A protein has these predicted regions:
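Beta-rich carbohydrate-recognition and catalytic domains
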Residues: 1-14, 22-74, 78-122, 132-184, ...
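Signature of short aromatic-glycine-proline-rich micro-motifs recurring in repeat-based ectodomains
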Residues: 18-20, 127, 183-194
Length: 230
């Protein structure tokens, strides 16, 4: 759309970061595009919500509630059992799940994933909104390990009960190699969203906060390589 969004309100005067956009299907079948992002006022961060139908005009509004603290709130692409759903990281360490009747207010969250592997031992987060597949909700995650190294992993959540983790990758999907190590923020690969085209997952990701890469992988192949969670 060739639109550039600039800070326009005090909470975001010093930054609008990590927008996680999703194509959201409303109850009546119409489509709205939402984007959650982190606003920074130089001292504090907050969650904000962008909304657009055409990517030419946007509205922005605050997101409140204990589950919206921190960074990385990512909306599901539709309601589940009549409620909005979102991935959260309110404690800044684990991946959580929140539900709400009000897209602007998220009161509580429950933990669905804690660090288990060395590459994610320090911190977990999501890499954008879940992608609906026949097997479940495909969630890309990021993990932070030794030397503040960021890697990208994946989870599979139950379609009807997203709080239930069905499977997960034991090893990272993308890990910083020699070409990813140097840059403004070294040892980091990070994404705010991917999309599926037929059986291909297209994953844009940032490298060292300096350049962008794009990876593709079979959706079925990715899911089949996961380890089932008991």
């Amino acid at each position: 759309s060739e639109r550039v969004l600039w800070p326009h309100a005090p909470p975001e005067y010093h930054g609008m970061e990590d927008a996680r956009f999703v194509r959201f299907t409303n109850d009546d079948g119409t489509v709205t595009y939402f984007g959650t992002y982190t606003a920074f006022d130089r001292s504090n961060i907050s969650q904000q919500l962008l909304q657009t139908d055409d990517f030419r005009t946007f509205t922005s509004s605050p997101i409140a509630g204990a589950a919206a603290l921190g960074k990385g709130l990512a909306l599901f692409p539709r309601k589940v059992h009549g409620r909005y759903m979102a991935l959260t990281r309110a404690d800044r360490e684990t991946n959580g799940l929140a539900s709400s009747d009000d897209i602007h207010h998220w009161a509580t969250t429950e933990t669905i994933q804690t660090p288990e592997q060395p590459w994610e031992v320090l911190q977990l987060g999501n890499c954008g909104s879940p992608i609906e597949t026949e097997a479940g909700w495909l969630v890309l995650t990021h993990g932070v390990g030794p030397m503040r190294t960021y890697a990208i992993g994946a989870l599979l959540l139950d379609l009807e009960n997203p709080a239930k983790v069905l499977a997960r990758l034991v090893d990272p999907l993308i890990f910083p190699d020699d070409q990813h190590r140097e840059g403004y923020v070294p040892n980091v690969v990070y994404s705010c969203g991917a999309f599926a085209h037929e059986d291909t997952l297209v994953l844009p990701y940032g490298v060292a906060d300096q350049w962008i890469g794009i990876s593709t992988v079979s959706v079925d192949g990715l899911i089949s390589s996961m380890t089932t969670v008991a």
